Amino acid sequence: MQINGITPQALAAYGIHDVRDIVYNPSYELLFKEERSPTLQGYERGIETQLGAVAVDTGIFTGRSPKDKYIVRDDVTRDTVWWSDQGKGKNDNHPLSQETWTHLKELVTTQLSGKRLFIIDAFCGANPDSRLSVRFVTEVAWQAHFVKNMFIRPSDEELEGFEPDFIVMNGAKCTNPNWQEQGLNSENFVAFNLTERIQLIGGTWYGGEMKKGMFSIMNYLLPLKGIASMHCSANVGEKGDVAVFFGLSGTGKTTLSTDPKRQLIGDDEHGWDDDGVFNFEGGCYAKTIKLSKEAEPDIFGAIKRDALLENVTVLADGAVDFNDGSKTENTRVSYPIYHIHNIVKPVSKAGHATKVILLTADAFGVLPPVSRLTSDQTQYHFLSGFTAKLAGTERGVTEPTPTFSACFGAAFLMLHPTQYAEVLVKRMKASGAQAYLVNTGWNGSGKRISIKDTRGIIDAILNGSIDDAEMQTLPVFDLAIPTSLPGVNPDILDPRDTYASIEQWQEKADDLAQRFITNFDKYTDAPAGAALVKAGPKR
């Protein structure tokens, strides 16, 4: 048995033996048939919806499991990885011994041995010079469908000489019975070995572990080569001008980068090298909770045959209730990027970025709707990765909840955050890019900044009119803010003007400034971080 050069002997090199059959890079048509097979049970089986997409259930894991993430600590990683047990910063890069890795690998390979396997060969990264050739091995048809959607699909010619740089073995059906004596978090695991170039998955069925696993690997490899690795969306204008949008969930990253006047490069993961900005992925992984055709026509229209829904409620007639979050608020859909019409073709890459937009949704009502950042301020706010959620009514919570996530993606960083900031600013200086902090949150009026005003701000950034505006300095945070912008309500540009008195703003600003200062202390164990303290707020 040999399929595209994959033989039982090749799989034996990974530790997988006695394979019954190999389904290699199956077509969407075959996957559609396989994942709905009446012989499948439990989480393996998908169901067809009225929209044409197949829906699956990922079990108790409806999101990533960061506490179960491990990296083998060896000569390759010992002095490069940002470890959870070293330094000031708390992170999810938990060290794993070679001995425990060997045991976990045996668990997964035993699970996959003797089975009918689906193998997907794909690329991570649209630039051939820095892309990873990744081989995914799974016994579950819909997991093969997920990675076919999310990663870059090679041509037949590219598959002929395909040599994997990295192997992902998904043994979702197996768990680790020895986790306690090994000092691990639970019986489930997502483990990486940078020397063997392998990712192992056990116990969790969540598809995003494969997507974000490879993002984490790119986040390790690329910055060490001087290439920026970014958790951002990106688009390009008619004149070839590229903008990247950083932001945590709920800040408007997807909404604001989706613009009828600009083509989408990608919605989530990008690199920036000597040639420009490029997508890591060949698909999109969009949230679907409360999705409607009216509010998000592009995403809604992408949910059709070949798309894969996760953890949504499917009614008896096959209709999807996107408003039902009873299983999870993190309902998702994956689909190939060409399901979105206004995209960069044929390859998801463009030139160098000239605008870098850091999005925040400040529920404290302190930050201005837009400010122009210096190079040091860019690094400071990039490392801070701030956003905040409105206070809930439960348990008497009366103040907003701040979130600080390094580089707007702390969960996926394998190196110290300052390394990502340094590489980003180096790329920005080389291209003459300017950064802006855009607040899509609230102000002193208690109302959220309108999408109309925010879009006006984004337009002013992209067309350059903000750089011609008269600027003033906002105290405490020392931010340069425009006094007026075309199409934007001038009364909101200085957040102090939205309060009954400047003293009210000052009190809140001092409080938020202290939160920034306290958070940023964890980066001061690196010289680059300590040097940036002066670019932050002052009390």
Curated annotation (Swiss-Prot):
Cofactor names: Mn(2+)
Xref: Gene3D superfamilies: 3.90.228.20, Phosphoenolpyruvate Carboxykinase, domain 1, Phosphoenolpyruvate Carboxykinase, domain 2
Chief localisation class: cytoplasm
Binding site for Mn(2+): 212, 231, 268
InterPro entries in alphabetical order: PEP_carboxykinase_ATP (IPR001272), PEP_carboxykinase_C (IPR013035), PEP_carboxykinase_N (IPR008210), PEPCK_ATP_CS (IPR015994)
Superkingdom classification of source: Bacteria
CDD domains from the UniProt entry: PEPCK_ATP
Family designation: Belongs to the phosphoenolpyruvate carboxykinase (ATP) family.
Name of the featured protein: Phosphoenolpyruvate carboxykinase (ATP)
Species this protein is from: Pectobacterium atrosepticum (strain SCRI 1043 / ATCC BAA-672)
